[in-house]
Regions:
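C-terminal catalytic domain of Rieske-type non-heme iron oxygenases
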Residues: 1-118
Length: 118
């Protein structure tokens, strides 16, 4: 059974199994709430083609650390970083041809780019 939040009866998510809440605060802050605590990701542009992500963790309940969503957070963040670096390498390849956004796969990227242009 996955570790989930104990949600009060007067909350809109009462009765649901919620393992994590994710908030993105434009443009570069992500707050990831888990039953064990909070993971903070800060995206720090270092130049036109270089970005650093600073990860911070605040453990509120050590007994839940390592369980459920966010339980193996270091591994997941390493995998995410590898995927982003691989995509970047492919997009910088001479064979890559930029095209339209994929409506089924790139809604988040499209939304982010629209926010940047506003």
């Amino acid at each position: 059974d996955e570790e989930c939040f104990d949600i009060p009866s007067n909350h809109q998510d009462y009765g649901k199994k919620i393992a994590a809440y994710y908030w993105w605060i434009f443009p570069n802050l992500m707050l990831n709430f888990y039953p064990w605590g909070l993971s903070i990701n800060v995206v720090l542009p270092q130049g036109i083609s270089l970005t650093k992500i600073a990860y911070y963790g605040l453990i509120l309940d050590k007994s839940k650390l390592g369980l459920g969503a966010g339980g193996d957070l270091d591994t997941v963040e390493d995998e995410d970083q590898w995927i982003v670096e691989s995509c970047d390498k492919g997009m910088n390849s001479p064979l890559y041809q930029r095209g339209r956004y994929s409506p089924s796969m790139e809604q988040g990227v499209h939304h982010f780019h629209r926010l940047i242009t506003e």
